[in-house]
Amino acid sequence: MISFLLCLALLIIGYFVYGKIVDNTFGPDDRETPAVRINDGVDYVVMPQWKLFLVQLLNIAGLGPIFGALQGALWGPVVFLWITFGTIFAGGVHDYFSGMMSERNDGASIAEVTGRYLGPVMQNIMRVFSVVLLIMVGTVFAVGPAGLIVTLCKNSGMSGLLTTTLFWLIIILIYYFIATFISIDAIIGKIYPVFGICLIIMAVGVIFGIFTNPAYTIPEIWANFSNMHPSGTPIWSFMFITVACGAISGFHSTQSPLMARCMKSEKQGHFVFYGAMVCEGVIALIWAAAGCALYTITDGKMAGLAEALAAGQSAAIYDVCAKTMGGVGIALAMIGVVICPITSGDTAFRSARLTLADWLKIDQDSWVNRLKLCIPVLGVGAFLGIGNALGFINYTVIWRYFSWTNQTLAMIVLWAASMYLFKEKKNYWITAVPATFMSAVSCTYFVLAPECLGKMINTYADGKLVAYNTAVAYPIGIIFAIAMLAIFIHATKKHTASQKA
C-alpha cells in the first residue's frame, strides 16, 4: 500500500512541479485563442475551464485507463512505476503539446500540426493514419457497447428486438451522427462533464473499498519487483504498450484539438491538457492497484487476475466494482462499460470529420458542408459495424494492432513537438527524450509481438509460442530509437544551417 501512496503522491507533485515546467517551456501568453477569434458556434465555442477539463478527461479516457491498467496489472505492482513516470514525463507532455500546438495553429487537427513541423510527407501519412484510426476506434466503440447492452437486456429477462446487437448498434450510430454533426456544446459540452465525474467517482469508490476492507492489500513494488505475468510475457515493451491510455496514448492527440478550439485563454492548457492526463494516470493507478489487490497471487504470478480477465474485461470491471462498492459499484460499472466507450466513440468520429475538413479545406460553418463529411465518415463506420454485427467482418485481428498504432502515433507527435520547440528556440529535450523512449517501445513491440514480426523471430512448438527472442528485438528497438534521435538532431542542424544561409 505504501508503494501505491508514494506513486499517487508523485503524480500529484508531478502535476504542480513538472507540469508547470512543461507549461513554462511552451510559454502561454495573452494572445486571442481560436475559440475567441473564430467562434463559429459549432466547433469553435468558448467553454468554461471546468467543462474543458472534464470533457477532455472523458474524451481521452473512456475505458482506456481501466482496461489498460487491469491488463497491465498482470505484470504485478511494477506497473505502478510506468503509470506514474509515464504519465508525468511522457503522457502529460504529449497531451499538453498536442493541445497547445493545435491551439497555436488555429485549432488544426494533429495531422495538420504534425505536417507543419515534420514536413508534407509525414503530414499525408498522418492524415490517412488518423482518419483510419479514428473511424476504427469509433466503430469498435459502437460495436462493444451494443453487445454489452444486449447482455444486460438478456440478463434482465428481455427478448425480441431489444436483445439484438444490430438494433442497438443502429441506435448508437444514429446518436454518433447527431453528436458529430451538431455544435460541440450542444451534447458533448453539456452532458459529458457528468459522465467525467462518474468516471472519477467510480475510481474513488474502488480505492475507498480497498482501503476499508482488511481482506484486500495492495502489494508493494519492492517485495514484488519481478515479472508476475502468468504467461511470462516480457515487461519490455509489452507492458508499456498494453497500459496505453493510463500512461501515454497517441489517441489523445486526436482529441486534444477539440478542446484547443474551445479554450478562452492559453493559460488554461496546463490544467486542461496536462491536468486531465494526470487525472487519467491517477485513475489508471487505482485500477492497477485493484487488479493487484483483489485477486490471488499464485507462485508469484497474477493468476487470479488473469482468470478474471479471461471472462472478459467488462466482467472484470463488474467484479472489481461489486467487490469494492457493492450494489452502487455495479450501477457505476454499468455506466462505465456502456457510456464511457460511447463517449470516446462519438468524439472519435467528430475528430475524423475535423481531420478531413482540415485536409480537404472544407469550411465547417455550413451545415451542408458538415453533412458532406458526416455522411461518408459515419457511412464507413456503419458498414464496418453492421458487417461485424452480421458476422462478415472480424475486428479481432485488426484490433490487435490498435495498441501499437496508438503508441506509434504518440511517438510521432512527440517528435513533432520537439521540432516545434527547436524552431521556437526552446528546450526541445523535454519532448525529445520521451520521443526517443517511445521510439524504442514501439519498434521493440513491432519486432517482438506475434501479431507483428514476432512470428518470424520467436520460438514456436506445435503452433504455440514457447519463447520470445528478446536477444534480437531489444537491440533493434534501441538502435531504432538512437537512429530516430540522430535523424532529429541532423534535421535541427540542417535547419540551423539554412537559416544562416
Which residues does each PLM region occupy?
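Loop-to-transmembrane helix boundary motifs in multi-pass membrane proteins
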Residues: 120-127, 162-170, 275-284, 292, ...
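Extracellular/periplasmic helix-exit of transmembrane alpha-helices
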Residues: 99, 209-221, 275-319, 386-393
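Membrane-interface "cap" regions at the ends of multi-pass membrane proteins
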Residues: 10-66, 268
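Helix-loop-helix module between adjacent transmembrane segments
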Residues: 10-11, 15, 56, 90-106, ...
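Hydrophobic alpha-helical segments and their helix-loop junctions in multi-pass secondary transporters
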Residues: 138-156, 167-168, 180, 199-227, ...
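Hydrophobic, membrane-embedded alpha-helices of multi-pass small-molecule transporters
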Residues: 47-64, 207-215, 225-287, 332-344
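Extracellular loop-to-transmembrane helix junctions
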Residues: 1-19, 72-102, 111, 330, ...
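Membrane-interface loop-to-helix entry segments
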Residues: 9-27, 129, 145-149, 165-212, ...
